[in-house]
Amino acid sequence: MNAYQKTIGRAVTLSGVGIHGGAPASARLLPADADTGILFQRSDIKDSAPVCAHVSQIGATDLCTSLGAREARIDTVEHLMAAISALGIDNLVVEIEGPEVPILDGTSARFIEAVDSVGVVTQDAKRRFIRILKTVRVEAGNSWGEFRPYDGTRFEVEIDFECPLIGRQKFAHDVDEETFRKELSTARTFGFMKDVERLWAAGLALGASLDNSLVIGDDNSIVNADGLRFKDEFVRHKTLDAVGDLALAGLPFIGCFSSYRGGHRLNSEAVKALLSDETAFEIIEA
C-alpha cells in the first residue's frame, strides 16, 4: 500500500479516435498538486470548467462511463481511470480534445505505457482510503454488485452470456499494480458483430474496429485474426472496467467488490450506495 500521494513526472499526450463518435480524440495528462484529485477538462471548449472524476459527476452509463453533462460531457473515461487507479496516481489533470477519451487499443495498456514514459512522482501528502466496514449490495433484475469488508483490495467479477464462446466466466483476485499490469491491462473491450452493425446503423460505435475491439461473429467465433489474449479475456475486461468505474469513488478502497452480470451502471450504483451509507465505510490515512 502506497503511503504517499502520487502524480506524474511531466505532461504526456495520447491521440486516437473516440470509439462512439469515430472522431479524432486526444488526452493530455498533466501533473497536479497534492490533494487535487483527478480532474477532467474539455480543452476544445473555451472556459470549460474542470470536472472531478467522481461518481457524483457521472452523466451517463450507456455503453461507457461519462462525466459531466450536455455539451461538456466526456465519454469513455473507464479505461484511463482504471490505469490511473492501478498505478496509484492520486492527482492528475486530464485535458480532453473532443467529447471522448481516445479508445486507443481498447484496453488500459497504452495509458500505462504513457505514464511509464514520464514517470511517477511521490508527493508530500499522505494517501487516504475508503475502508469498507459492512456489506452494501445493489441489485437490478438478475444482476447484482456488492462491497464487503476485506483486508486488501479484491475484485470478484462474474459474467454469464448465452453465447457459448463466453458462457460463464469469473475473475477473482486481489488487484494491485502488478496484477493489473499482468492480468487485466491488455484485456480488450468486446462486442458482437450483430450489435456493432446495429450501432453503426444508428450512428454509434463509429470508431469501433478490430484494432480496438474483440469482436464475436455471428457463428460465435472470434473475428480478430490474433484470437483471444486470455481464454477468459471477456471477464478480465469487465474487471478492468470495474476497476475504472470504482475509481470514481474518489479514493482507493480497502475491501472486496463482487458482481454478477454487472456493467457500468451497476458499478456506479454500487459506489453511490456505498457512499450514501456513512456507517458502511470510514476514511483512513495511510
From Swiss-Prot:
It catalyses: a UDP-3-O-[(3R)-3-hydroxyacyl]-N-acetyl-alpha-D-glucosamine + H2O = a UDP-3-O-[(3R)-3-hydroxyacyl]-alpha-D-glucosamine + acetate. HAMAP family: LpxC. One of its GO terms (molecular function) is UDP-3-O-acyl-N-acetylglucosamine deacetylase activity. It is an enzyme of class 3 (hydrolase). Its cofactor is Zn(2+). Its EC number is 3.5.1.108. This is UDP-3-O-acyl-N-acetylglucosamine deacetylase. Catalyzes the hydrolysis of UDP-3-O-myristoyl-N-acetylglucosamine to form UDP-3-O-myristoylglucosamine and acetate, the committed step in lipid A biosynthesis. One of its GO terms (cellular component) is membrane. Gene3D superfamilies: lpxc deacetylase, domain 1, lpxc deacetylase, domain 2. Disulfide bonds: none annotated. GO terms for biological process: lipid A biosynthetic process. The active site is at 264 (proton donor). SUPFAM superfamilies: Ribosomal protein S5 domain 2-like. Zn(2+) binds at residues 79, 237, 241. Belongs to the LpxC family. Keywords: Hydrolase, Lipid A biosynthesis, Lipid biosynthesis, Lipid metabolism, Metal-binding, Zinc. Pathway: Glycolipid biosynthesis; lipid IV(A) biosynthesis; lipid IV(A) from (3R)-3-hydroxytetradecanoyl-[acyl-carrier-protein] and UDP-N-acetyl-alpha-D-glucosamine: step 2/6.
